[in-house]
């Protein structure tokens, strides 16, 4: 059981650190949107690259924030029955859901995106706009990174659920839980 706890803590720590860093990018995105509005409407200067950078950050925040959201149980669920379940029953639902749905979907996204991302890298795909950002291939790489990070956190959730189902008191197993505010 000790190796499982070590793996679980490593994944949880990685997800927590990356999630908190990514959360700060929303502030950068707000600043860039204000900059786009000010330069466009007050200075009458438009910047395609600046507008695209907002889109890039938006993609980065949403795609790379999925694992952090999963860790903090922030994904939408229909919990008509779930909320009344015991912790062990909830863990069983999470374990089965993780194994039957989360893992296969992450693998499907990764493998169906693989050729698409490689093709973009092969040509160093750039923006269709003349003054756009020349890094579309990097943006598309998020399509591979997202399922990897989500799968890693899914594995952590499966481990936690498995421990609960097997009767282990996870609060006494030195699992890292960080509930501090991001800001």
Locations of regions flagged by a protein language model:
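Alpha-helical transmembrane segments and membrane-interface helix-loop junctions
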Residues: 1-183
